């Protein structure tokens, strides 16, 4: 056990950014019982977390919102946790399909009170949209420091 004190934002050593990859969220090659267990864990993690500055919800641009995504958005809305949708795998869809998915996503988010209005579009393979995603995170951090 360490007796050293953990750095705090006031020390200037920890900006308070934590990235959490949710297990089994979206697509997972696992038994349904395991996925159900992970889903419950995710919802419990997201509920009542006032310290979450923003959750970035990654949505596969090839498919748009799935039921599991809508359930998570409802949980975030009920918990008043701000979130921003990031469409991923933009390189794997035609431009016209991407534009349609983006428009449908923006239209759907109007009904979600905790949703941040700007939808980001990314491709990890080509790097498109990644600077914008990083910039959005940095802006948010600067607002909170």
Predicted regions mapped to residue ranges:
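Conserved ATPase-coupling elements of RecA-like P-loop NTPase cores
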Residues: 28-34, 64-70, 94-99
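Canonical P-loop GTPase G-domain recognition
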Residues: 92-145
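Inter-motif core of Ras-like GTPase G domains
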Residues: 33-63, 74-86
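Switch II (G3) loop of P-loop NTPases
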Residues: 12-40, 60-63
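Short, electropositive alpha-helical surface patch
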Residues: 70-80, 139-145
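Switch I (effector-binding) loop of TRAFAC-class P-loop GTPase G-domains
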Residues: 1-14
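Conserved nucleotide-binding/hydrolysis micro-motifs of P-loop NTPases
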Residues: 17, 24-26, 62-65, 89-94, ...
